[in-house]
Amino acid sequence: MKGGLSPQNMVGLDTSSPPVIFVVGTAGAGKSSLVTSFQRWSRFLETEAIAVNLDPGAERVHYDAEFDVRDIISLTEVMNEYDLGPNGAQILAADLVAAQALDVADELHALSGELIIVDTPGQVELFAFREASSHLIEVLGQDQAAIIYLFDPMLSRSPSGFVSQMLLSSIVEFRLGLPTKNFLSKSDLLEEEELEKILEWSERLEILELALYDEAGGQRTEFAINQLRMMQQFSQSPGLTPLSSETEDGMADVLTFAQASVSYTHLTLPTN
């Protein structure tokens, strides 16, 4: 590791550094696809987005990663050296990356771009519930970081599946302490009626409550409704924004959220 860096000198605390957007969600929610599509979309608008891969278990990515954790951590080597299975190796790999957090921050902030978008590990718990992630966020600059949480569209079609994702998103926001906005990933896969229903659930709590009672009822529903009401009181970014990596719907919303959420004054949407 490089020496001579005190917390006061960390690049992440320099407000001239670009914002860092962590893309978080359950396995298969479309995190890598979003990073790929957002990078392509931003280049078309001549807005440079720096793509970062923090998933050591990714077999391949389709975006141009300016930093790829697989260049410094080999999951296979970790498994062999420490006699671990895939899950244990993923956890240890996250800790090994965190141990090099200052070097990672130096490398990222030496790059020229207007936004850093980070593809996190496939399993949400590997990013959200490890101290290594909190340390990495702190080094990169907590005041300049935010989270995009992706809802899986298939799971969102049922009231209980939708509420489960709302709860998980809130837990991630609470755990990492970053501004968080929810996006409905792969919205192009849904029928128009399904999409409208899900968006209505996200905007009108009373409609979601009725749907929960129709689906199940009982104590489980009462518990979910109580949690939802509490979440509604404290939510900083209510609602759900449709997002599609195929049609590029919602990409401008991602950029606008980044602009509004972090201490960075030079990031703007193109006017033409």
Language-model segment annotations:
Residues 3-24, 33-36, 40-117, 123-127, ...:
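Nucleotide-state-sensitive switch-loop elements of NTP-binding domains
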Residues 27:
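The conserved Walker
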Residues 265-271:
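Conserved small/polar residues in nucleotide/adenosyl-binding loops
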Residues 30:
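Conserved glycine(s) of the Walker
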Residues 125-226, 231-232:
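Conserved catalytic-core segment of NTP-binding enzymes
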Residues 247-258:
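Conserved GTPase G-domain signal focused on the G5
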Residues 1-20, 192-194, 199-202, 208-209, ...:
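Intrinsic disorder/low-complexity signal
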Residues 23-24, 53, 117-120, 147-154, ...:
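Conserved beta-strand segments of the P-loop GTPase G domain that flank and frequently precede/overlap
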